[in-house]
Amino acid sequence: SMEGGEPLLEYVDSGVVSFELRQFAVHGPLDLLLQRMTQCGPVEAVIPLSDQVWANYETIMQPIQANQAAFEAAMQRPMEERFVVAAEQMGYLDFFAARGISEDQGRQCLADVGALEDMANYTQRYSSEFDITGTPTFELNGNKVDANTWGALEPILQRAGAR
């Protein structure tokens, strides 16, 4: 996703291409936690925060890979605590605090059971309706395209008229 960010925005700025980010927690609780944190601030921050997650994905994955048991234990806590505890233990509150989402704001967002359930239900409903099996998944004019890298997507956009 990071390799195509700037070129994609150039197509969008030309008025020929539109881009809509839809977040799906296809990989389970960690995706749900990160998705909720990217949506914790103002709407205009969602894409920049998502870009930061993708750009730092290896760093984000290190604590959970090093301590899967702690993450799994956090997921056994009551719903209003589990994502807060996981984010504290894995350093995700610090990650987002460095990008404008205060720790208090992050804790509040991650304790919002209704919002988390809505996100999980959204993922379940649309993942099956649109056959979303991984990320990224791209759709062009209502049809899923067989591309998950910028190198594969750009020629498809160009064949559809993007310049």
Regions of interest found by a model, annotated:
Residues F83-R163:
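C-terminal cap of thioredoxin/glutaredoxin-like
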Residues M2-R82:
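Structural alpha/beta surface segment adjacent to cysteine/selenocysteine redox centers
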